[in-house]
């Protein structure tokens, strides 16, 4: 991105418009400073957490000096990557530090940087003031801002991690990282070694889980295991969403197959405390009043871990009906069922504990 002297002067003039106040939160700054366009989202405009309020607390971990490790074990369509992008943008603008974004492969890292990360910066005036005058200092993999640096690396190229002291590490989709070999050390281990030069370092781990022994599930277990609780619109008690509480009407077409249209229309959530019927609109409203609650009192101080299934997503592909149909289609095969459990429920796969025989009107699945 080439900036003329006039553009640079105008950006300097606007600096105070985006300068954070001491009491400004990460979320406040992001919502005032970042813009998403059609290149990143189907809902372009100013960055906002209003539809996905569960992203707010994890975002504040970027500023919280008592937190040094954050794990997001989240399902699909939950905005975990956008949440990380907003937090990293805040860091670059407000606490300039060397940072590393580690992804499964270098080609994926390059594509992500080019198609999602850099467009967000270029569309946000507050971030343009962090750009250097020399355009060649910002590439897809190496980005030297005016006061900070960011490097994108693939886990399949661990040699690129050598001699890179960083204060902040983002390890994205860690369960898809390349395994260590006799010739190459584990990329995640190497990346974490790079944090030792900074006493205020932070590490953010994200992924949908795969198996119990996988990286993200083990990281979640060692943290304080936070889960998002919502108020039931009927009894007002706080509950965490569980797949077994999703139900639908038994509906078959003339050929004996599932009538997916009727199933999608009838699916709803049943409160596990009062048995009240919770609709999709109820869920969206309840999200605004949700609370993250830690469930592991034995976690080390400063080690946060958040679990969030796609049940919480307000996305149209995560309605009760859409997920019910996805489940019925997926359970026809073990591979499909594992994909549903990992991707939508954000739970690890344990084949020996899976019960494939279920009633046709229940979402019961034991993992």
For the regions a protein language model found, what residue spans apply to each?
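Phosphate/NTP-binding elements of NTP-utilizing enzymes
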Residues: 2-367
């Amino acid at each position: 991105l080439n900036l003329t002297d006039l553009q640079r002067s105008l950006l300097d003039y606007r600096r105070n418009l985006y300068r954070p106040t001491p009491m400004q939160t990460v979320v406040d700054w992001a919502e005032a400073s970042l813009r998403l366009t059609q290149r990143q989202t189907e809902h372009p405009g100013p960055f906002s957490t209003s539809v996905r309020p569960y992203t707010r607390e994890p975002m504040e971990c970027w500023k919280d000096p008592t937190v040094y490790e954050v794990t997001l074990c989240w399902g699909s369509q939950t905005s975990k990557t956008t949440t990380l992008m907003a937090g990293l943008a805040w860091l670059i603008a407000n606490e300039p530090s060397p940072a590393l974004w580690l992804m499964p492969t270098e080609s994926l890292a390059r594509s992500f940087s080019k198609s999602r990360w850099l467009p967000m910066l270029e569309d946000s005036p507050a971030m343009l003031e962090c750009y250097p005058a020399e355009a060649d200092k910002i590439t897809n993999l190496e980005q030297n801002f005016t006061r900070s640096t960011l490097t994108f690396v693939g886990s399949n190229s661990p040699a690129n991690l050598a001699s890179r002291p960083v204060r902040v590490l983002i390890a994205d989709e860690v369960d898809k990282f390349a395994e260590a070999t006799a010739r190459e050390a584990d990329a995640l281990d190497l990346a974490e070694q790079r944090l030792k030069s900074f006493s205020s370092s932070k590490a953010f781990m994200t992924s949908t889980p795969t198996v119990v022994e996988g990286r993200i599930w083990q990281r979640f277990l060692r943290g304080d295991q936070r889960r998002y609780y919502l108020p039931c619109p009927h009894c007002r008690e706080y509950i965490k969403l569980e797949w077994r509480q999703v139900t639908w009407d038994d509906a078959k077409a003339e050929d004996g197959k599932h009538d997916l249209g009727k199933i999608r229309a009838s699916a709803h959530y049943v409160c596990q405390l009062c048995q009240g019927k919770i609709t999709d609109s109820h869920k969206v409203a309840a999200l605004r009043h949700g609370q993250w609650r830690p469930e592991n009192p034995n976690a080390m101080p400063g080690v946060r871990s958040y679990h969030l299934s796609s049940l919480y997503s307000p996305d149209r592909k995560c309605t009760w009906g859409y997920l019910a149909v996805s489940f019925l289609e997926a359970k026809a095969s073990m591979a499909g069922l594992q994909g549903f459990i990992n991707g939508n429920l954000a739970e690890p796969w344990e084949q020996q504990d899976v019960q494939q025989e279920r009633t046709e009107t229940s979402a019961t699945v034991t993992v």
